[in-house]
Swiss-Prot record:
It is an enzyme of class 4 (lyase). This is Polyketide biosynthesis malonyl-ACP decarboxylase PksF. Its main location: cytoplasm. It comes from Bacillus subtilis (strain 168). It is found in: Cytoplasm. Belongs to the thiolase-like superfamily. Beta-ketoacyl-ACP synthases family.
Length: 415
């Protein structure tokens, strides 16, 4: 391999499952064409007295390597995790790696609220018939257990929760585990958060989730950074990244996707959903500092961009304060919806695939940007080779995270 002055940590495998496609090729194709799956949600346990708009996964295709018995007992979130992890695992050729040197960090919590609520409704008057398997599956750690069981991971595994920043928290933890030497390879998995209508009602009452304003035209509901936005629109998704040191990747003969060159976490000391301008500025600046990048080095931003009334405004103010309004910017959630715990990883995957395709996807429904001085990618995808990207995630409870992603296309060939 050629010797390159790369940052220490790289991505060697990617897996993604979302409403717009299972697998990175279908996902990338949908992103670049702006193809979406927004509709009034129909999955059992999601509708009652209100109409909630979202982007649901139509079906899952299961690889042969997965245990059919395990799949029958697993929750929907766990099944999505297994198929997503399989794609990343096989691309990174981890069957040949030492399983005791592989770790797994799962981003998220409360993964199966919809199924939990259905269990309650079904068995509230006959609790003696509840399956013993529910004693395992209602715990978040069961998702770790299922994945480590199926793939023989014996290094480490745990979950990290940070609301909608959970995915990026998992990525940062995975980076730290690799750099500490605890494991050689660590998988960050953003798990599918399976909402019931109860969570949808509460999030709508909180003013976070979109109303039924667009129920008769669901394709127009998800509109981050647009003046007519109406709150976030939920989108089922799951993403996985295989993260390792560059030396490990090159020794194993792998060509990395990109380097994770900088990252930061900052708390606001606030349990409410309110965003913090200071917190967002802090993580942007610290991530750039760790990556040894200047603001002008960033040429693409993948923002948190949910379509919330206050959050979108604050995020653009933070980017402007950090002198980043020159960079191209688009909103992945305008196509995928908001994956909540999975969003941070799914959006880093969006960055990696746009790097690979040398193209930027459009932002749907960005008819009237709240600030048209930014360098928006609007109605159509464009050809562009990203050099340095910044991805942001924020979560309820004062969570702010940022990750810098460096294109290393010229650093992976044979010498």
């Amino acid at each position: 391999m050629t010797k390159c002055n790369l940052p220490e940590v790289v991505v060697t495998g990617v897996g993604v499952t979302a409403s717009i496609g299972q697998g990175k090729e279908d996902f990338a194709s949908s992103l670049l064409s702006g193809r979406h799956a927004f509709d009034v949600m129909k999955r059992s346990g999601r509708q009652k007295d209100s109409r909630f708009i979202g982007a649901e996964i139509a079906s899952l295709s299961y690889p042969d390597r997965l245990s059919k018995k395990m799949l029958r007992k697993a929750s929907f979130s766990s099944r999505a995790a297994l198929v997503t992890l399989t794609e990343a695992w096989e691309e990174a050729e981890l069957d040949d790696a030492d399983s005791s040197r592989i770790g797994l960090v799962v981003g998220g919590s409360n993964f199966q609220q919809r199924e939990n609520f259905e269990v309650y409704e079904r068995y509230q008057d006959r609790s003696g018939f509840i399956s013993p398997a529910y004693g395992l599956s209602f715990m978040d750690s069961d998702l770790c257990g299922i994945c480590t069981d199926q793939f023989g991971i014996t290094g480490l595994a745990y979950t990290v929760g940070g609301a909608s920043a959970s995915g990026q928290l998992a990525v940062i933890h995975a980076i730290q585990q690799v750099l500490s030497g605890e494991v050689d390879t660590c998988i960050a998995l953003g798990a599918l958060m399976d909402l019931s209508y109860m969570e949808c009602e509460a999030l709508r009452a909180l003013g976070a989730m979109g109303t039924d304003k667009y129920a008769d035209e669901p394709e127009n509901a998800c509109r981050p950074f647009d003046q007519n936005r109406d709150g976030f629109i939920y989108g089922e998704s799951c993403g996985a990244l295989v993260i390792e040191r560059k030396e490990t990747a090159l020794r194993r003969g792998l060509k990395p996707y990109a380097a994770l060159s900088g990252w930061s976490i900052k708390l606001d000391g606030n349990r409410n959903p309110d965003p913090s301008l200071e917190g967002e500025i802090h993580v942007i600046q610290k991530a750039l500092e760790r990556a040894r990048l200047l603001p002008e080095d960033i040429d693409y931003i993948n923002p948190h961009g949910t379509g919330s009334f206050i959050g979108d405004e604050i995020e653009l103010k933070a980017l402007r304060a950090c002198r980043l309004s020159h960079a191209y910017i688009n909103a992945t959630k305008s196509i995928t919806g908001h994956g909540l715990s999975a969003a941070g990883i799914v959006e880093i995957i969006s960055v990696l695939l746009q790097m690979k395709k040398s193209a930027l996807h459009p932002s749907r429904n960005l008819d009237h940007p709240i600030d048209d001085s930014f360098h928006w990618v609007n109605e159509k995808s464009i050809s562009y080779r990203i050099k340095n990207a910044l991805s942001l995630s924020m979560g309820f409870g004062g969570m702010n995270t940022a990750v810098c992603i460096q294109n290393i296309e010229k650093c992976g060939g044979e010498s």
